Amino acid sequence: YGSELLGSRLGEIPGTLGAQLSSENINEDLYKGFEIVIGHRNKINDFNYSVNLNFALTRHLNRFIVESDAVNSYDRWRNKYSNRYTDMGWTYGSNGQFTSMNDIWHSPIQDGQGGATQLPGDWKYEDWNGDGIIDSNDVYPNAYEHMGDNGNPKMTFGAAISAEWKGFDVSLLFQGGGGFNVIYFEQLQYPLCFGGNGLAHFYDRYRQDESGNWIPGKWPTTRDAGSYSVNYARCKQTTYDASYLRLKSMEIGYTIPKNLTRKFKVDRLRIFASGYNLFTLSNLDFVDPEHPEGNYGYLYPIMRNFNFGLNLAF
């Protein structure tokens, strides 16, 4: 529980004041959660092993934030943050893709320009409130995002496993996260963003043949930068479950028997091979699931490393 956090009362007063207010110690937040750690080790003749498991669940609650009063129940639900968890993701719902211009003409307008910028293959957003118009009033909470600004998933878990047998040893470290989504709307809806390259996903996009007929694809068609606003929104189609399990490290070694090493005046000799970030199980196949969406996924991928070596003791 945290109290007297910095905040400004600017949200409580009309914008006509035309002045900035200094920060005060007025906001409050609360972290809720638990952690479980289980360990076991045993020896069976020459075989030694140990297993350690951990699991944690944490949620962050804005217990109190200085903000203006809600004008109605919808405003309170959509725009206010006091007494609300920080990991709620608001997006448009999914109605698939537009399959033709006729489909666009007979669907609610969603580009604010009478459909002038819409093309077959564009995402078809859900008219969630049923008013016949696709706008900001149609977004709703349907995802668990990275919590706040720290990029932590709601659930974390891991396992450390080690074993030894007649000079051989092995150790493994697994880590994972779950119960959260990422929404990489920039890469998936603006494939040539800022003049950069697009993801390989867009080889399978809606496109026209030489006769002008539309060929269906999994992703929207590409176009010049000025026409991307129709797809440049957070939507269910670009929301991914980022749960993952990663083999973070693994090491295999063998210790040479002392009756052999002492002939060379070596007290202990162990050879080993190790690897880091060996594999990841995840629904995300185009970006690392640990990359927070706040950076739009624009980070260098993690490195897979392999090491070989020996430990000597004289």
Label the model's feature ranges:
Residues 38, 51-53, 172, 271-273, ...:
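Membrane-embedded beta-strand positions of outer-membrane beta-barrel proteins
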Residues 1-4, 40-42, 55-61, 165-167, ...:
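Transmembrane beta-strands of outer-membrane beta-barrel pores
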Residues 177-270, 275:
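Extracytoplasmic gating/loop element in the C-terminal half of outer-membrane beta-barrel translocons
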Residues 14-15, 22-31, 73-99, 209-213, ...:
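C-terminal beta-signal and terminal closure region of outer-membrane beta-barrel proteins
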Residues 27-29, 43-150, 189-191, 207-212:
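Conserved small-residue
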Residues 21, 30-35, 48, 154-158, ...:
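Transmembrane beta-barrel architecture of outer-membrane proteins
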